[in-house]
């Protein structure tokens, strides 16, 4: 994912029907959905609603991108009017708003929600006995960049690429997965934003998946917290061996502290923006989503909440029936985001007689 701070990601889909599990908020329909996007003449949802952040997020899009404003401003305006006058999804058509339901990986409408956040990690400008793990800027290696293991072994030493030094390996690793992040330099009390600068073009391997396959963390308990707990319980050599299972490495470029932005270049608001697959959800697309609500321990609360969200980011692991919900900045946001691997129903929205009309339409090669 483009402009995020330190991040994480990469999860798979679960399927179900009638008596199948619903512990991750799955819902089962009386019908199956044949396509990725399926025309919905009426949206039926009785979930509690919270549309409070949509107006602010849509305003940031209009202010920040003339091209997206040209396409989406009329739809945003109609959605804001709909929120003021009704907010009932069954009345969308009365405002000229069209909907297409995502079919879900199981063709039952269950769309996977994971979470991401903007971490703030502690760095120092110079290494010492504690802060000794470098965060790197982009090297001039083109397609012959070293692997993670080679970088850990010193392949980039002496090139002046060190942007700062962390107190462990896992914090920079998580920032790499997120794609960007905020850093706090404790030696001069400054806050900087480390934006994504590039990567070494090696294949990404999920360390969460490795931990599950090795039987070190149960699949049902996998989360960012579970990964960090495992890291804290093991020595540096063991942790390093695990991280080296992922040869991919992300490089950063520092900038003054700024609003967190996604790949669309628009500031992101927590619980109002998502990363999605731009082949079916172009940047700026508004969606109506039944977002699963979780308990503090990461289990599903038994409820969903209906929200208006805008797709403003992308990610290598975010494909088709998978959305990555932005949770905000800092440790609490990270804890909440790390719990998310649950399901909800999602509708892509469009406005009749506008560039966004017929949101169910896909190029023939993408129809499934």
From Swiss-Prot:
GO BP of this protein: cell wall organization; peptidoglycan catabolic process; peptidoglycan turnover
Domain of life assignment: Bacteria
Record lipid sites (N-palmitoyl cysteine): 17
Record's keyword terms, sorted: Cell outer membrane, Cell wall biogenesis/degradation, Lipoprotein, Lyase, Membrane, Palmitate, Signal
Intracellular or extracellular location(s): Cell outer membrane
Gene of this entry: mltA
GO cellular component, one term: cell outer membrane
EC number, UniProt record: 4.2.2.n1
Catalytic activity: Exolytic cleavage of the (1->4)-beta-glycosidic linkage between N-acetylmuramic acid (MurNAc) and N-acetylglucosamine (GlcNAc) residues in peptidoglycan, from either the reducing or the non-reducing ends of the peptidoglycan chains, with concomitant formation of a 1,6-anhydrobond in the MurNAc residue
Role of this protein: Murein-degrading enzyme. May play a role in recycling of muropeptides during cell elongation and/or cell division. Degrades murein glycan strands and insoluble, high-molecular weight murein sacculi.
GO function term, MF aspect, one: peptidoglycan lytic transglycosylase activity
Name of this chain's protein: Membrane-bound lytic murein transglycosylase A
Tagged with keyword Lyase: yes
Keyword Signal on entry: yes
PANTHER family: MEMBRANE-BOUND LYTIC MUREIN TRANSGLYCOSYLASE A (PTHR30124:SF0)
Pfam families: 3D, MltA
Signal peptide residues on this chain, from the entry's feature table: 1-16
């Amino acid at each position: 994912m483009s402009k995020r701070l330190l991040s994480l990601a990469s999860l798979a889909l679960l399927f179900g029907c009638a008596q199948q599990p619903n512990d991750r908020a799955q819902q089962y329909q009386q019908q199956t959905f044949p396509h990725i996007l399926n025309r919905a003449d009426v949206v039926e949802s009785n979930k509690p609603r919270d549309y409070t952040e949509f107006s602010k997020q849509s305003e940031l899009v209009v202010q920040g991108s003339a091209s997206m404003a040209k396409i989406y401003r009329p739809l945003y305006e109609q959605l804001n009017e709909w929120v003021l006058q009704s907010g009932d999804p069954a009345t969308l058509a009365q405002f000229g708003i069209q909907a297409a339901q995502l079919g879900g990986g199981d063709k039952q409408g269950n769309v996977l929600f994971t979470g991401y956040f903007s971490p703030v990690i502690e760095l120092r400008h110079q290494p010492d006995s504690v802060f000794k793990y470098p965060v790197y800027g982009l090297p001039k290696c083109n397609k012959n960049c070293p692997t993670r293991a080679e970088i850990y072994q010193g392949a980039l030493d002496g090139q002046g690429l060190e942007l700062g030094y962390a107190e462990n390996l896992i914090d920079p690793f998580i920032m790499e997965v997120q794609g960007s992040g905020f850093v706090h330099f404790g030696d001069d009390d400054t806050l900087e934003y480390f934006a994504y600068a590039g990567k070494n073009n090696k294949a990404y391997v999920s360390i969460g998946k490795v931990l599950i396959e090795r039987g070190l963390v149960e699949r049902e308990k996998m989360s960012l917290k579970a990964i960090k707990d495992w890291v804290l319980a093991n020595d540096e050599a063991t942790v390093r061996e695990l991280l080296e299972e992922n040869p991919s490495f992300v490089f950063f470029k520092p900038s003054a502290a700024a609003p967190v932005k996604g790949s669309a270049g628009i500031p992101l608001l927590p619980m109002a923006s998502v990363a999605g697959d731009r082949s079916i959800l172009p940047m700026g697309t508004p969606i109506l989503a039944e977002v699963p609500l979780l308990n503090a321990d990461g289990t599903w609360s038994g409820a969903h909440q209906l929200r208006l969200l805008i797709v403003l980011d992308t990610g290598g692991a975010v494909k088709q029936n998978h959305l990555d919900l932005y949770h905000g900045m800092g440790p609490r946001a990270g804890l909440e985001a790390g719990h998310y691997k649950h399901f909800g129903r999602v509708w892509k929205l469009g406005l009749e007689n506008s560039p966004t009309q017929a949101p169910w339409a896909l190029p023939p090669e993408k129809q499934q």
